[in-house]
C-alpha cells in the first residue's frame, strides 16, 4: 500500500510542477481578451473620445449625462418590465410543458424536439420573421407593429417566449426526472393530492432547475439586443421634455439597444455610451447575484 502511494506521489509531483505552464496560456488569453478590455472600458467611461487613443478625461460628466438622458430612463423602464413579464411567462410555460412531457405521454420525445427547435434560430432571423407575421396580422386592422408601443412590447415578449421556452423546458425536464421516486411514492401513500405533491414535493426538489432557468431568463432579458433591433428597432419614437431639454425617445427600446444607438448615432456621446455600458454591467451583475442568492436559499438538499 505504501509503495502504491509513493508511486502516485511521484506521478503527481511533475504534474504540479508544470501546472503553471499549462494554465499560463489560458490565463493570458483571459487577461488580454477580457480583463484588459474591461478595465479600459471603465477608464473610457470617464473620457470623451472618438477612438481610445484620443480619449480626454472628463470625470463624471458622462455619468451625469446618462442620468439626465430620457431615452436611457425609458429603456431601463422597458427592460425592467420586459424582464418581469418574460421571467414569469417563460418559466411558468416551460415548467408546465416539462411537467406534462414527464407524465409518460405518447410522443413525448417528438414534442421535446419541436418545442426546442425555435432556440436553434438566430435572434435577428426570428425578429424579421415575427415582424412579417405581426404586420401581416395587424394590417387587417389598418395598423402595423411599430405604430404603437404596446404592439411592439408584447410582440417582443411573444417572440422571446417562443424562442426560449423550449430551452428552459429541457432544463426543467432534467430536474423533474431527478426527483426521487421514493418521495413521490411516500406522498402517494400518505394520501397527498396532485397539487400537494406538486407544490410540497416536486417543486422544492426542482429548485436547482428553477434557479438556473430564472438566472438565464433574467440575464437574457436584460441583454436582449438582436431581437429588439430586428423586430421594432426601438420604434415608434416620440419627443419628450427631459431634464436636459427635449429629446427623442424610442418607445420599445431596451437597454442594450439604447447603448448601441447612443454609440453609433451620436459620435460626441461615445463616452456616454461607455458609461451606460458600465452601469448596465453593474446592474445585471447585482440582479443576477441577488436572484441566485434568493432562489438558492430555497433549494432542498438531496
Indicate residue ranges for each PLM-predicted region.
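Short, Lys/Arg-rich, polar N-terminal cytosolic tail immediately upstream
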Residues: 1-13
Amino acid at each position: 500500500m505504501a509503495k502504491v502511494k509513493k508511486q502516485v506521489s511521484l506521478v503527481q509531483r511533475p504534474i504540479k510542477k508544470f501546472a503553471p505552464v499549462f494554465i499560463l496560456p489560458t490565463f493570458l488569453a483571459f487577461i488580454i481578451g477580457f480583463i484588459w478590455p474591461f478595465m479600459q472600458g471603465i477608464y473610457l467611461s470617464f473620457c470623451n473620445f472618438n477612438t481610445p487613443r484620443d480619449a480626454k478625461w472628463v470625470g463624471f460628466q458622462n455619468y451625469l449625462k446618462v442620468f439626465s438622458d430620457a431615452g436611457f430612463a425609458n429603456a431601463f423602464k422597458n427592460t425592467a418590465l420586459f424582464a418581469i413579464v418574460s421571467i414569469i411567462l417563460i418559466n411558468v410555460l416551460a415548467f408546465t410543458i416539462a411537467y406534462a412531457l414527464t407524465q409518460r405521454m405518447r410522443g413525448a420525445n417528438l414534442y421535446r424536439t419541436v418545442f426546442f427547435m425555435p432556440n436553434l434560430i438566430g435572434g435577428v432571423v426570428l425578429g424579421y420573421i415575427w415582424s412579417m407575421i405581426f404586420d401581416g396580422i395587424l394590417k387587417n386592422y389598418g395598423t402595423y407593429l411599430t405604430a404603437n408601443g404596446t404592439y411592439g412590447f408584447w410582440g417582443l415578449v411573444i417572440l422571446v417566449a417562443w424562442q426560449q421556452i423550449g430551452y428552459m423546458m429541457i432544463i426543467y425536464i432534467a430536474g423533474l426526472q431527478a426527483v426521487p421516486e421514493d418521495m413521490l411514492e411516500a406522498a402517494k401513500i400518505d394520501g397527498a393530492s396532485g397539487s400537494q405533491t406538486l407544490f410540497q414535493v416536486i417543486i422544492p426538489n426542482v429548485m436547482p432547475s428553477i434557479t438556473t432557468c430564472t438566472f438565464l431568463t433574467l440575464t437574457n432579458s436584460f441583454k436582449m439586443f438582436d431581437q429588439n433591433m430586428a423586430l421594432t428597432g426601438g420604434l415608434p419614437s416620440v419627443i419628450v421634455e427631459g431634464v436636459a431639454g427635449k429629446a427623442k425617445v424610442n418607445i420599445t427600446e431596451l437597454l442594450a439597444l439604447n447603448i448601441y444607438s447612443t454609440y453609433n448615432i451620436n459620435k460626441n456621446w461615445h463616452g456616454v455610451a461607455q458609461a451606460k455600458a458600465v452601469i448596465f454591467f453593474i446592474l445585471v451583475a447585482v440582479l443576477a447575484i441577488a436572484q441566485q442568492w434568493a432562489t438558492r436559499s430555497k433549494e432542498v438538499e438531496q
